[in-house]
Amino acid sequence: MSVKAKRHLLVGPASLWKMKQDFQIKFLKENGLLPTHKFIDIGCGTLRGGIPLINYLNTANYYGIDVREEALNEGKKGLEEEGLIARDPNLILFEDFRVLDLGVKFDVMFAFSVLFHLEDSIAKSCFEFIARHISDDGVFYANVNDKTQSEGKWLEFPVVYRGVEFYNELAKDNNLTMKTICTLKELGHISNDDRGDLQVMLEFRKDC
């Protein structure tokens, strides 16, 4: 197993890390991400998706937040290996969305394979965080499990299945509008596992 594959085991299957990395930056660029944008990666983990984004965005425009120090430390090793320290990404370890204030308004906010690892109360706090930090013309993208299946655990996190209406209500509570884009498979995410490929990508914007 390669060093990168072993590192990214902290965020998903070793065999899929490159596909998922490529998928994220491709999706974001196709949906308007520019180097000049302020961008936040919610649940950035080991920077599986973050490395190419840090390379693409202007210096210091990438923000990555995570609750796991081990994952962030592995991400920092990846930055060194890729020669990206000078890109000055903002990597932030935190414990609670309710007290996290970055003092930045983001053009693009992204949570890839994160929301379905949050209990309902934490998901609520996450959306409040998003509402505080999204710019007037900003956008938040997130993929979710909207099919009913048996819930379980992944590492120390729950795996929850909630209909998109749950997220629509959170959006309304925070003056955001929600749009369902399509399944990840339709966007080019091909893992040959319907649990991932049939997840739905959602888009949220300020309700102006």
Predicted segments with their positions:
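Conserved acidic residues
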Residues: 107
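Class I (Rossmann-like) S-adenosyl-L-methionine-dependent methyltransferase catalytic domain
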Residues: 1-31, 46-101, 118-125, 129, ...
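Active-site charged/polar residues at nucleotide-handling catalytic sites that mediate phosphoryl
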Residues: 104
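Conserved class I S-adenosyl-L-methionine
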Residues: 36-45
